[in-house]
A protein has these predicted regions:
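Class I SAM-dependent methyltransferase Rossmann-like catalytic core
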Residues: 32-79
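Conserved class I S-adenosyl-L-methionine
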Residues: 82-91
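Substrate-binding/catalytic lobe of Class I Rossmann-like enzymes that use SAM or dcSAM, i.e.
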Residues: 204-286, 290, 294-300
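A short glycine-rich, Lys/Arg-flanked "PGG" loop and its adjoining helix->strand segment in the class I
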Residues: 176-188
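Conserved beta-strand signature within the Rossmann-like core of class I S-adenosyl-L-methionine
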Residues: 185-199
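Conserved SAM/SAH-binding beta-strand->alpha-helix loop
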Residues: 115-116
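Conserved SAM-binding loop of SAM-dependent methyltransferases across substrates and taxa
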Residues: 92-105
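N-terminal auxiliary segments of SAM/dcSAM-dependent transferases
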Residues: 1-39, 46
């Protein structure tokens, strides 16, 4: 079945250019300066993230795939029959396929993705792999309230699928808010299937965000490329560098864009000064113990019903239900 059989529905929840400019200017007024990580994900950024997942240092994707190789059938049994799978993100070619192959008579698959082109590619990929599966793509920002399309038949349960470790990119307060939003959207009897990266040797964690090929560095600086293109700023990429280090007290990777000299950047009508060595925070990647994440989920009115681990116990997939 061709992808033309599916309507790429646009929820109009993507930020307009003026909103991007306002967000950037507000973040650059802060001390220290700070920009939101969703700015990474234009089409180039989405592709670079896929490339990051292929780097030898980036254990997260391999660990999650190893986990699914062992446990996908058990996960499908826990989710049960007639599930509507709502994925926050456009769909990993491998991980989502592994899960969909095991699901028992799923009602539909709904990828929610802010970037139109990765979403179209996802629809085409999965419509070819699963020609009998109803696919209902939604182009939207999954951090904001969603208008879910009507499924082709009534599901027994809505399951929000949030693979990878994206929940770790949210600070605790924002992660709780997002989990509460998921709790509302899944409805009574629904669940959340979520990837959670675990605390481990800090050297292993740091290497994953500082690959030798420099793909993560390119991904980080692509944010500035996007801003120059979309809002007409004049960031000089040669004058900034990527930095990511693990903060063991906070249990997270902290990613910054660092100015390599004193400089002034034009952002709209605003002129922003950067000092030599000044760091602008662009992303956190939080790591959890199992008890840490159970506590976080409880604050959102959820409880952990099942936990699956990869063979090396680097990564977890957890199933949450209403407490």
């Amino acid at each position: 079945m061709s992808m033309q059989a599916y309507e790429l529905r646009d929820d109009d929840r993507r930020p307009p250019i003026n909103d991007v400019l306002e967000v950037v200017q507000r973040g650059l007024r802060l001390q220290p300066k700070r920009l939101p990580s969703w700015l990474f994900y234009d089409e180039r950024g989405s592709q670079l993230f896929e490339d990051i997942c292929d780097q030898p240092e980036y254990y997260l994707t391999r660990a999650e795939i190893d986990l699914l190789n062992v446990h996908a059938g058990d996960i499908a049994d826990v989710l049960g029959e007639d599930v509507r799978l709502i994925e926050y993100g456009s769909g990993s070619a491998i991980k989502t396929r592994m899960l969909l192959e095991q699901l028992h008579s799923p009602v539909s698959y709904m990828p929610v993705e802010i970037s139109p082109e990765p979403l179209r590619q996802s629809v085409q990929r999965f419509s070819e792999l699963f020609p009998q599966l109803a696919i209902q793509p939604l182009c939207a920002d999954f951090t904001r309230p969603l208008r879910l399309p009507i499924p082709p038949r009534a599901p027994r349960r809505n399951v929000i699928y949030f693979p990878g470790s994206t929940i770790g990119n949210f600070e605790a307060r924002d992660a709780i808010d997002l989990l509460r939003k998921m709790r509302n959207e899944m409805g009574e009897g629904g669940g959340i299937l979520i990837g959670v990266d675990l605390k481990k040797d800090p050297a292993v964690i740091e290497a994953a965000y500082n690959d030798k090929a420099g793909v993560t560095a390119e991904f980080t600086l692509n944010m500035l490329v996007r801003l120059n293109r979309e809002i007409g700023s004049d960031f000089d990429l040669s004058a900034f560098r990527h930095r990511a280090h693990y903060n063991p007290m906070a249990g997270r990777i902290e990613t910054h864009i660092v100015s390599s000299r004193y400089q002034q950047v034009k952002v709209g009508r605003m002129h922003v000064d950067f000092g030599d060595g000044e760091a602008m925070q662009v992303e956190y990647s939080c790591k959890y113990s199992l008890s840490d994440f159970a506590t976080l989920a409880a604050h959102a009115g959820l409880k952990v019903q099942h936990v699956w681990l990869d063979p090396q116990q680097l990564f977890s997939v957890q199933f949450l239900v209403r407490a």
